[in-house]
Amino acid sequence: MKYGIIKVKRAFLYEENGVDVVDEVFFGWSVMWEDEGEWIEVWTHYGYRGWMERNLIEEKSREWMEEREKAGNTYVVTRGFADVMRGARVQSRMLETLGRGCFVEKMEETENGYCRVKLANGISGFVPEVALRKRLDSDRFLWGKSEERFFVEQGIPEGWSEEKFRRKVVECAKGYLGCQYRWGGKAADGIDCSGVVFMVYLMNGVLIWRDADIREGYPMKAIWREGEEMCLVEERAKAGDLLFWRGHVGMYLGDGRYLHCTGHERVFGCRVNSLRRGDEDFREDLAEATPTRRSHSMIFTAARA
């Protein structure tokens, strides 16, 4: 097995035919693969598969990957966009622009509210410290011994509490409001329904399945069954839980409201809607396509109890 990191700002994963987009990865994200070629099938650090161009990956040894994990100086861009500057001042030359979700190596040098970072392509420059957060998720799936159980047994981030986690994921999700819809996307300039909830959970240290369904082996469980009344959602769901329809997913915010990214022709983006019939922003079409599952994010906690 070979290992590497993405060395461009963004790269799309495709179906084997190289035409249909299935996912998006960013600077510094880890992948592994077996067979070489112009196009290769990769496994991501969150267990998803897809095909991408080999020249977008910087090959690394497994030892390098493990050492990066242990070092703990990988940070993630939390702002929609963040410029990498040659110097630690706003007037300096811009070297690169990073999007939310990009991983960088944070160096010790800091100045004027900036910190020096190193990118996966070797570029080094300064980024505002407020645009970064210490990475909380893990690459260990790529070399783990228990692949089937890794995601339900992934470690709890330091200082974790259910109340804090729920508050953080809701706050993070709202950062995508107004973002346009893009099939397979996970970026602040284009994202799909499952991309939003995946990124929100990743930014807060939990890796979930990337698509709009509940996949065995990942930290989600159903707390609502098909055929039950919609009114039961508010009784059982808490802020930060995920709401699943067939082929669609959103995040419950509380008070009968949910955030989702939709390709519907009248919206085509990320917005908030109501579950309550009679509200101005109630989605009749989603009400008719009754959600098949209600997913309780906190199985992540139960799995560690």
Residue ranges and their predicted role:
Residues 206-276:
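...with weaker cross-activation on analogous glycine-rich loops/strands in unrelated enzymes
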Residues 28, 98-104, 237-240:
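Loop/turn positions that initiate beta-strands
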Residues 1-8, 183, 214-225, 282-305:
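N-terminal non-globular leader segments, chiefly Sec-dependent signal peptides
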Residues 1-5, 10-12, 19-37, 43-78, ...:
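Boundary regions of SH3-family modules and the immediately adjacent low-complexity/disordered segments
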Residues 153-155, 174-185:
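Short, flexible active-site loops
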Residues 141-156, 160, 220-230, 280, ...:
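Charged, glycine/proline-rich intrinsically disordered loops and linkers
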Residues 173, 185-204, 208-211:
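Active-site nucleophilic cysteine motif
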Residues 25-26, 82, 86-89, 93-97, ...:
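Glycine-rich catalytic cores of cysteine/serine-nucleophile enzymes that process amide/ester linkages
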